[in-house]
Amino acid sequence: MKKYPLKAATPHSYVYSVRNLPEVTVEQRERALNATHWNEFAFPAGMLTVDMLSDSGTTAMTDLQWSALMLGDEAYGRNNGYYVLLDAFRDIFERGGEKNWKNAIDLIRTGCKDVDKLMDELYLCEYEGGLFNGGAAQMERPNAFIIQQGRAAESVLMEIVKKILAERHPGKVFTIPSNGHFDTTEGNIKQMGSIPRNLYNKELLYEVPEGGRYEKNPFKGNMDLEKLEELILAVGPENVPLVFSCITNNPVCGQAVSMANIKATSEIAHKYNIPYVLDTARWAENAYFIKMNEEGYEDKSIAEIATEMFSYGDAFTMSAKKDGHANMGGMLAFRDKGLFWKNFSDFDEEGNCTFDVGVKIKVKQISCYGNDSYGGMSGRDMMALAVGLKESCNFNYLDERIAQCNYLAEGFYNAGVKGVILPAGGHGVYIDMTQFFDGKRGHDKFAGQGFSMELLRRYGIRTSELGDYSMEYDLKTPEQQAEVCNVVRFAINRSQLTQQHLDYVIEAVSELYKDRENIPNMRIVSGRTLPMRHFHAFLEPYANED
């Protein structure tokens, strides 16, 4: 095959739809900030220049996704999207690579009218023993639950686990460790009365090599295995109902988690008979990092790596609004007759299952979100997601996405901004606010939130504070406080932003860094103790006098 290499990267896509932005003045943004009580989630998106609040559901979908969306049907029971979506999950997370994919959606795309073929290859296929039962097995032992987004999947999981534990051990308090619980996961764990713990290597996270570049990704998102086993032994395995890993590790600056660490965490959890749960919102980005940086995976496809990652988990939650490359969707699943099922189902003395935990989850799904055919999603969104999951297996797409993250992070670093977390994560860039402010702002100042609000006020750039304010530093125990990363995240929306957007952000942050002494602190006016307070608390800025 002939090649004529260039220094410039080869384009792999076109942009066919454009949204124009209004000209918004600083005074107009100030008025809106005051009206919305300085809550970044309440600020009107239509007044922003660059929105980097979240990469969740903000994806610019592909032409194949939009065409699939038009094939969706809205039948209340067992619409086509139900079958197609579950089989897309099987393709990627169970079948070991593209060569083994069934691509069930092609039956719908081609307008198949052969009813026997549809029954044999789509509607009535039996699957059991994995993460996505099908046919009669899914009705008898439901283990895969379509839900409209990740936090809803977490909520269903935690509510059912809480109910079962409360019935078995009234009044008992449990601990649930992770390499890093995100804000919604932590909030759901707290609301079930349990204690979340984040076990990672904080010292490694803040290390930056000379010049800011790593030859290989150091997998800073890894679970600290020593801390995990120490915690399990300290509180007792019987008091740890679940062990989590977040891949990539969103609260720890979107850092990658190695396959070796996923496997080792699974082994430790299983050593103590504890189910291992994966938070897999950014599974494809994590698979990319493994492919590019971990020995033995360089020749494997993203889908092959994903299958192995998921093989180590007993259950998983997923916000498919991230690496589902879609605007809506989620999933909760556990391994058929696996450890999660065994630990949370009821059995008689002879070992026969008397009540299946999957049935309990299904009842919750139906009562809160919709029947198991759609779980709160529209049929057309399910079709778009089925395609989007496979779009995320495209290496060229992932390579360009990670390159955008690296460009932004290196742009900050080269501009002299302190506190940039390197290497960049897979979905955005994080700046440590303690270093940014030269260690001069106390935890009670919520200066990271002040930075986020000032960036919005001056330049129309919305980011997400994920530090002292959002992670509720002031409400935590000293042990938990030590596990908080005091950071602000610049999330990069999938397939949406151009280099012009990133250059604008780099210049704005560079200018704000030079004037950091004049960035205000923030105080919480109301909602300090509300669960996940950053979504609904009222704040106000005040001048920094230190």
Where do the model's predicted regions map?
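Conserved PLP-enzyme active-site core in the AAT-like
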Residues: 2-37, 53-55, 65, 77-84, ...
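A structural motif shared across PLP-dependent enzymes of the aminotransferase-like
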Residues: 42-63, 75-87, 473-476
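A short, surface-exposed helix-loop junction/capping segment
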Residues: 63-71
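PLP-dependent enzyme catalytic core of the Aspartate aminotransferase-like
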Residues: 167-168, 392, 458, 470-546
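Short, conserved charged micro-motifs
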Residues: 248, 438-447, 495-504
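Short amphipathic alpha-helical segments
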Residues: 328, 369, 427, 485-493
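Short beta-strand-to-loop capping motifs
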Residues: 334, 431-434, 492-494
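Conserved small-domain helix->loop->beta segment predominantly found in fold-type I
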Residues: 373-453, 457-484, 520-530
